[in-house]
């Protein structure tokens, strides 16, 4: 796990060395996160775009392995359709560790949310406490939910609801989502990437689209997905585009299934590995 500014510092260092040596530079950032609006926004994405604007620099990043993870939910509202129920299954591991999820509603919009526990208890998220942390305490399941409601997120202009679960009860949690302004709009919800959350926590009606991780959604990064070089089939778990601004991502595919690489474990020096980071 790396902070975004740590990655930016590392990139800045190798960029300085390349300029000092007057050499072209190729950077591979084999990491990704599913947090954010997936518009290609954010300090790291903007930094990558600024570097990739120069022809002597190339930045390759993985698309991610979220295609079949069931970590993304998408709903599009029509003119007469303003409410939806999002169902999320919470597993045993998260009941002790907790987890987080993000809601992003397209602007212009005025979204509201009620959270329902597996026992049926409902608590509403206040839209009045803007940018402040709300604590929702469920009585029958002894769960606390910390919520930050941001009506206009400063980089995107979209509505962000940041939700953190503390000791969530195992079972089906529901998010009752509504839109006060009739018309066409949509919202997304994303869970953390594989490895940061167990496979037992997922949306019951997921969407595999818009699952390219950040910084893979950056406009000028070379975003790489993976395929099986033996039969030219795409890697089924690879994340899928576009980004939410409809920029085409990933940009291309490279071999990334059962690639022989150096082993970090005991025993063999080399072992097969799979993923879009290897493809990048």
Each PLM stretch: what is its role?
Residues 1-280:
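Loop-rich non-cytosolic ectodomains and luminal regions
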